[in-house]
Amino acid sequence: MSRVKANGVEIEYEELGPRDGVPLLFINGFGSQLTSWPAEFRQSLADAGMRVIAFDNRDTGLSQKWTGQIPDMKAVSEAMRAGRKPEVPYTLDDMAADAAGLLDALGIDSAHIAGASMGGMIAQLVALDYPKKARSLISIFSTTGDRSLPPSSPEAQAALTTRPLSQDRATVVAHAVKGRRSYASTRWPFDEARLGALIGRNYDRAFYPEGTSRHWAAILAAPPRTERLKSLRLPALVLHGSADTLIRPEAGRHTAQCIAHAEYHEIDGWGHDMPLEAIAVVSPLIVDFVRRVEAKKKAA
């Protein structure tokens, strides 16, 4: 792994695949590190010849941390409902600027911009605010932020908003595993042991719940992107699971409806996670999409 300054922020990142491969920037979700998804997912894309760049978002993992008081989430939500600008340490727009800045720091003019969950929200903003940097948009179990979309299930919502009883490793891992189960895929077995081991490694690498809280504030403070997404004119792939109870599949469908000519794939029984079995379904969709976009670009 390596570290660069992007948008004035120290960002930890990792590359897989050939340096001369088609660049794909992967943006992680709420509170998650670049190591939070199975390594096999990024490796599968790299094995297809892509230059895969993943990074720790600001305030998480080994990237630069923020300090200071945690935002009052109730006040942030009330400000948004009242049409006022909420007070938050940073916004999703700032995080999109980090992603664009990382490409600049690596000397990459443009890349396929992929993001999952909150990372999908950030990827949408990269495509909107830095269009020359986005060869395509790949939005994975994410949303437009439209307030009329169905909410998370009570169990999934609780998984995000409740805290473990203590911050020791065993308690944090058990709490996270229980939460992930609430929005896991129904199509494949829930591998508690493997997930617990992954969460434990991430705890050892960089446990920083304060950053997760600030990420949540940034999500709450983000205005809907519905109308802005209608202006996009780039290739877009939207992937969602029918069993996602955290960000409902209606959100994925709505994202695809807002982007002209977007491709939408709703995967039966897939939740808000990436079990090993899902990689064999999701990765080929991404590889095929990127190859078609690149072929069309060369033919133009």
Task: Please annotate each region the language model reported.
Residues 212-228:
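Active-site nucleophile elbow and catalytic-triad environment of alpha/beta-hydrolase enzymes
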Residues 243-247:
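Acidic catalytic loop of the alpha/beta-hydrolase fold
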Residues 170-213:
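Conserved alpha/beta-hydrolase catalytic His-Asp/Glu region
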Residues 128, 137-167:
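Flexible "cap/lid" loop of the alpha/beta hydrolase fold
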Residues 9-82:
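Conserved HGGG/HGGXW glycine-rich cap/lid loop of the alpha/beta-hydrolase fold
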Residues 232, 238-240:
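Short beta-strand/loop motif that positions the catalytic acidic residue
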Residues 86-89, 93-111:
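Conserved acidic catalytic loop of the alpha/beta-hydrolase fold
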Residues 262-300:
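Catalytic active-site module of serine/aspartate enzymes centered on a nucleophile-bearing elbow/loop
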